[in-house]
Design a protein with these regions (language model features):
Chain B
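Short microdomains enriched in Cys/His and/or Lys/Arg
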Residues: 91-106
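Electrostatic cytochrome c docking/interface patches
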Residues: 25-63
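Bacterial N-terminal signal peptides that target proteins for export
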Residues: 1-8
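Solvent-exposed, acidic/flexible segments
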Residues: 41-49, 63-67, 101, 105, ...
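The canonical Cys-X-X-Cys-His
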Residues: 67-77, 132
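N-terminal signal peptide c-region/cleavage motif recognized by signal peptidases
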Residues: 12, 18-20
Length: 164, 139
């Protein structure tokens, strides 16, 4: 049997490429991180700052975060044991190297999970993406904190962190 | 007639009971603070919304640097929304503006616990909590 190898190969290539694009489009590009959907996690992790998407950090980071709530970036953010277990389970199963892997591949590139980084804003990729933001903009009264994603990313609460 | 009156009672009593159950958590909170305040100071003479208002606006500067006062995060006007250092909007603290507030005692305990430490650098006394809450309930 004579197979038309070249057209078939080209066809497959085109198919693979569009599948890749389609997957990206569905995920909203590399700047989409699904927002927290669990009401307990939204309440407990989203009162002082935006409830950061679990896919922005590896599971090791969330584990460490939850074990250090007494000094949570200077605040005592302890919760009762049952709530803590609930939050830990959610964060760790949706983390950037577990359930949320498909959203985090770029953000966590170059991040060592064994180091369990606590600050999203110290991830190599995050720093690179925000290099062009001038110091005065960080100090602006409507920004003030690098944890204030929403100040510049108006879609942050819906999971979109595109360039604005 | 008699059965009608009975029917009315059947409707009215549960309605009254549920109304008081809805109002009770805030009163229970205040009663609890009052009992503690009396224990702390036998001369305790009740709570004052005016004292609570002064407390709300006072700059303590004994806790965290960026939160010297309640109004560092909550608005100066309790009926307006506040904002945390990380930019999160906080619903108004006045009951009239946020009618669901202060109904869950565990939540009230949690936030007094955290916020007093961050603003005053210590736990609030029962007198302080009762005064502040009285102010917010009156607003």
């Amino acid at each position: 049997m004579d197979l038309p190898y070249r057209p078939v190969a080209l066809g497959l290539l085109a198919l693979a490429f569009s599948a890749l694009v389609w997957q990206r489009a569905q995920a909203g590009g590399s700047h989409y991180f699904p927002p927290v959907s669990d009401p307990v996690v939204v309440e407990e992790c989203g009162s002082c700052h935006l409830a950061f998407p679990p896919s922005m950090l590896p599971a090791s980071s969330w584990k460490r975060m939850m074990s250090e709530l007494k000094n949570h970036f200077g605040d005592d953010a302890r919760v009762d044991a049952a709530t803590a277990t609930h939050i830990s389970d959610y964060l760790m199963s949706n983390a950037g190297d577990t359930g949320g892997r498909r959203y985090s591949d770029k953000l966590l590139r170059g991040t060592s999970t064994s180091k369990a980084p606590l600050r999203i804003t110290e991830l190599e990729r995050w720093v690179g993406e925000h290099r062009e933001v001038p110091a005065w903009e960080w100090r602006h009264k409507d920004v003030r904190s690098k944890a204030n994603c929403l100040a510049c990313h108006s879609g942050a609460e819906r999971g979109y962190y595109d360039d604005d | 007639m008699k059965s009608q009156a009975g029917l009315l009672l059947l409707i009215a009593v549960p309605a009254m009971a549920s109304a008081s159950a809805l109002a009770a958590p805030r009163e229970d909170l205040l009663a609890g603070y009052a009992a503690q305040a009396k224990q702390d100071d036998p001369g305790f003479a009740g709570f004052s919304a005016a004292r609570g208002e002064a407390f709300h606006r006072r700059s303590f500067g004994r806790g965290k640097v960026d939160t010297p006062a309640c109004t560092s995060c909550h608005a100066d006007d309790p009926r307006a929304a506040g904002k945390t250092p990380a930019g999160k909007i906080i619903d108004p603290v006045a009951l009239s503006a946020s009618p669901s507030r202060y109904a869950d005692p565990a939540k009230v305990r949690k936030w007094f616990g955290r916020n007093c430490k961050e603003v005053l650098g210590r736990a609030c006394t029962a007198q302080e909590k009762g005064d502040w809450l009285s102010f917010m309930l009156s607003q």
